[in-house]
Curated annotation (Swiss-Prot):
Keywords: ATP-binding, DNA damage, DNA repair, Nucleotide-binding. This is DNA repair protein RecN. It comes from the Bacteria. May be involved in recombinational repair of damaged DNA. The gene is recN. The keyword ATP-binding applies.
Amino acid sequence: MFYSLSVKNFILIDELEIEFNKGLCVITGETGAGKSILLDAILFCLGYKTSNNVIKHGKDYTVVNIIFSLNDEIKKFLIQNFIEPEELLLVKCLQKVEGRKNFFINNQIVTKTLMKQLANYLFELHGQNNNITLLEASTQRDILDSYGNLLEFRVQLAKCYQIWQNTRKEIEEITVKQNEIEQEIDYLSFVTEELTKLNIQIGEEETLTNIRKDLQNKGKNLQLIRDIIAEINNPEINISINRACKLLARQDYNDRFNAVVTSLEEAYNNLEVARQELSNILGSFTYEEYNLEETEERLFLIKAISRKYNVPANELGIFLDKSLEQLGILKNKIANSNKLQAQEVLLQEQYYKLASDLSAKRLIAAKHLEESLNQELKQLKMENANFKIEVKTRIDPTASGNDDIVFKASTNPGMKIEAINKIASGGELSRFMLALKTSLFDKMIKPSIIFDEIDVGIAGEAADKIGDRLKKLSSVTQVIVITHQPQVAGKADLHIKIEKTQLEQETKVKVKALNLAERQTELARMISGKTITAASLKVAKELLHPVAFSHDQK
């Protein structure tokens, strides 16, 4: 509920602060006194469209602060939007002459959209030009379902509808994309078969690259050994050594060349040893586990596959796993198609059974609400009004059921019953809403309800009845009423008066919460005009008698 309102430099207001009470709060004042300014300030603060020129003449900014009490629903909204709930809720709007509006919730800057979303949890507004929600089909449906205690049943229906629609969507996706799915299955089957067959291991490319490098080095060494052996095996070397030894043996000084002969013979023997050792080394190369050709073929294959699927060689195993997973999903989609179709039939039957039950309950609730509302309208002195609720089957099912709900009425005898937006004036719509709220009473009630001049065009007993209904409604929620009727104002728990004053070429608006004596004077003014008479004071006192009595008992 509204706890307090603080306004500064707003239109004709210099500065004011109002504290509100629970129950029924009325706002009165002479015609043109600026009663609507308070309402404009509230709408301005909560992000609704107001006049473009709201900053008081001569000032460079305006600011409006409203403090609300909290309930669990509001706390949940704040938490969902990352705003820390406090003991009370503070909302603020600041606008400078040269700038745009800035909105704050608990001193945290927010968007206008978020502020308006919050406002939906805080209050309702009904008046000459503010009954749009009553005209919306969704609101009319919610009113009927709330009256008939059908909201929980509707939640059950909505869950069934959602599952049904999700199943239908899945079937449609499979049907529309059947060829694509089958092509994808063929492709993934080929991919997974190829990669599984290749069995490429993590790190294999790097391992093979190192092996190839090693083999290439060994290949160079092998060729070198072969070249050396070829040189050693040259027969001319042996022939040359033998010939040298024979020549030395013929010399007269044979003894002097014995050492040379010995060296040549050792050279011959060493060549034989070297030849044998090199042959042994050469033979050992034939027992390597890998050969270069096989290694290069495997490396070429891995690189080709990597390029083919545009996947790093080291991630081909992951790519295979994902391909296998996707292949399984697509195969299951095809396999489950028939199951889904059977399931969709059952869900459709379940939905229409629930929707049919809801329609039947709505028809019963509609009849009872019609009777209740028509009685309330009579109490509000709309004896000629006739209210009807049309519940008709719609072509397309929805999460809210298979019905279109239309509130219809006629306000005068002989008039055709039509949708209420076509036949009712702003004031009549407000009284329709008051009658609905009274019929619903403790259902669909927000923390605060504002009625702006709901009693325009009525007086006497009708105004008294409206006051009674507003008073009754205020027992379950805070009700704020801008009124011209003393019968309504006399029932208030809090009476606020707005006055417009002219001082030195400047117009100002003054707001004051009245005490009991001041209320009597204000009611007398509302009864007789500017000239307050003894008779009007007496009537005012009688209107206030229940209030005065309740104050005396406190």
